[in-house]
């Protein structure tokens, strides 16, 4: 083919429509340079690509024009797509309005669909999407002014939960002591890949909490089934102390603070442990579900919180980021550093009776006194006053003396006689000592043993059910103290009914005693207010069903 023929063919191709390859008119538009009215600021080539996914490349040998027929088809397709998107968006908004009040689709903490509506007092924290780790206490403290005033107590509770995770469930990985000269990477290489995979697959990955009682589940279906079956849609919030049902969460918290526990109104549904804030209760509930998504890559031990994993990793790395401002000592956790800082300003009130040394803490004094005891025993053995003792017997003698000194009156610190751990409360020491025993708490029904009181209570509730029943409303409870608290509500209702009857009868008695010609209005006692007809009907129907003899306050005649 000659050059003139190639030029003729090229001119003919350039003058045709790029979309349909038909001839174009002189008023045709350029698909790369021109824009249309129905889609401004976007070229025709980009509109065609978004509709039909066809990429048009610019080349001097190819046409850049579009005919009027293809332009009309392009406009119709664009308007059709735009209308479909608007109609679908409108349907989705109508669907949200229809299902937002249904219990199954209420927004909550368990992954239910719906529009998130923050509750009263809710703290919204912006989180980096690339670092979706669990927030620490310090991050939440920045968003509230008065909620985190007791910082020391919060840290101690967080440290206590960390110890509870570390002690209660240690089968994920054994405690590994890092040899000298070996870093974390070499230690991780020695771990078994198969054991790590089995441990990761055995544990659930996520916890789902009930939006009404914060009960934890590992499956969303179980959580939704619990919300529909265990909670009344009209009054879904139930008190864990007296089983009274309320409509809103603020009403429930006000009820608990007024009648039951003003300091810790948020109660765990598993073990009845109380918390100051609901965020602490949520973190504690995850421990009961067994969900531990944060795993140590050195010893394969897993944790339910990222903050606890960070503290645990400092054991392997040896990093102590918290440094005392008054001395060169450093610590792995903020709780240890704060406890040490208090020792600088405190008066050393614990004086050793055998030397001039004094200490600010009782446990330090006890550890110091053990040095004197050990020296006395060595001197007596050298002088032949007592026979030499075995190493285990000496250790047992020191542990017995330590335990006796720790449990004296007004003692603030309690020591474990097995592993030398120290606790500030005696109940924490008892709960820790249960881990060293086979079974400390036994079920009275089936004699099954448990290491913790919370496990025994959970077993009694799930296996045997409640055993104390109210004789008035037939509500059952697991413990007698719960029944007694519940009966106080009936007693209060009974007193209110008596006052209502007295207020209704008093005007009639006063009218009978007054003269007939007396026209002055009757003056009632301001403390006795006449109830409405609905209240009188309610109390009159309720009083015959009550066991009034149980609430009788009259003493028998002598």
Curated annotation (Swiss-Prot):
GO MF term set: DNA-binding transcription factor activity, RNA polymerase II-specific; RNA polymerase II cis-regulatory region sequence-specific DNA binding; zinc ion binding
GO biological process, any: dorsal closure
Zn-finger segments (C2H2-type): 208-231, 237-260, 266-288, 294-316, 322-344, 350-372, 414-436, 441-464, 468-490
Residue stretches making up the ZAD domain: 15-94
Phenotype of gene-disrupted mutants: No visible phenotype. No effect on cuticle pigmentation, bristle and hair distribution and size, shape of tergites and sternites, size and constitution of eyes and wings, or fertility and survival of males and females.
Miscellaneous information on this protein: Piragua means small boat in Spanish and refers to the small number of mutant embryos that have a hole in the dorsal aspect of the cuticle and thus resemble such a vessel.
Protein name stated in the entry: Zinc finger protein piragua
Name of the coding gene: prg
């Amino acid at each position: 083919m000659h050059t003139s023929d190639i030029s003729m063919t090229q001119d003919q191709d350039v003058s045709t429509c790029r979309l349909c390859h038909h001839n174009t008119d002189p008023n045709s538009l350029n698909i790369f340079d021109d824009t249309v009215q129905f889609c401004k600021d976007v070229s025709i080539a980009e509109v065609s690509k978004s509709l039909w996914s066809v990429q048009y490349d610019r080349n001097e040998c190819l046409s850049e024009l579009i005919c009027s027929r293809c332009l009309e088809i392009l406009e119709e397709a664009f308007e059709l797509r735009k209308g479909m998107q608007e109609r679908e968006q409108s349907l989705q908004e109508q669907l949200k309005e229809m299902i937002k009040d249904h219990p199954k689709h209420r927004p909550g903490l368990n992954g239910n669909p719906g529009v998130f509506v923050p509750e009263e007092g809710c703290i919204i924290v912006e989180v980096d999407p690339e670092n979706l780790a669990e927030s620490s206490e310090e991050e939440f403290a920045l968003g509230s002014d008065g909620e985190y005033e007791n910082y020391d107590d919060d840290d101690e509770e967080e440290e206590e939960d960390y110890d509870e995770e570390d002690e209660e469930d240690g089968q994920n990985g054994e405690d590994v002591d890092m040899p000298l000269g070996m870093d974390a990477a070499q230690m991780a290489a020695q771990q078994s890949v198969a054991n790590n995979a089995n441990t990761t697959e055995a544990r659930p990955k996520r916890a789902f909490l009930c939006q009404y009682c914060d009960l934890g589940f590992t499956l969303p279906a179980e959580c939704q089934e619990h919300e529909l079956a265990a909670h009344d849609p009209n009054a879904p919030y139930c008190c864990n102390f007296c089983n009274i049902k309320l409509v809103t969460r603020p009403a429930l918290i006000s009820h608990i603070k007024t009648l039951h526990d003003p300091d810790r109104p948020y109660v765990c549904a598993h073990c009845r442990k109380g918390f100051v804030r609901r965020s602490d209760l949520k973190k504690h509930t995850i421990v009961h579900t067994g969900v531990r998504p944060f795993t140590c890559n050195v010893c394969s031990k897993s944790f339910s919180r990222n903050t606890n994993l960070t503290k645990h990793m400092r054991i392997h790395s040896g990093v102590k980021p918290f440094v005392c401002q008054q001395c060169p000592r450093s610590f792995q956790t903020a709780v240890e550093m704060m406890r040490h800082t208090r020792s600088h300003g405190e008066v050393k009130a614990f004086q050793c009776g055998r030397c001039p040394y004094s200490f600010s803490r009782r446990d330090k004094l006890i550890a110091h006194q053990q040095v004197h005891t050990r020296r006395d025993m060595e001197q007596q053995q050298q002088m032949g006053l007592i026979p030499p003792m075995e190493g285990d017997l000496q250790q047992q003698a020191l542990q017995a003396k330590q335990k006796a000194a720790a449990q004296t009156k007004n003692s603030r610190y309690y020591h474990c006689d097995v592993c030398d751990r120290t606790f500030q409360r005696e109940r924490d020491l008892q709960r820790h000592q249960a881990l060293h025993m086979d079974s400390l708490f036994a079920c009275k029904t089936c004699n099954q043993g448990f290491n913790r009181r919370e496990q025994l209570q959970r077993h009694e509730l799930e296996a045997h059910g409640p055993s104390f029943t109210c004789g008035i409303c037939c509500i059952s409870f697991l413990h007698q103290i719960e029944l007694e608290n519940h009966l106080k509500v009936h007693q209060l209702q009974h007193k209110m009914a008596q006052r209502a009857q007295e207020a209704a009868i008093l005007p009639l008695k006063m009218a009978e005693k007054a003269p007939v010609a007396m026209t002055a209005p009757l003056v009632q006692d301001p403390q006795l207010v006449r109830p409405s007809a609905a209240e009188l009907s309610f109390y009159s129907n309720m009083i015959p069903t009550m066991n009034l003899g149980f609430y009788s306050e009259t003493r028998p005649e002598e």
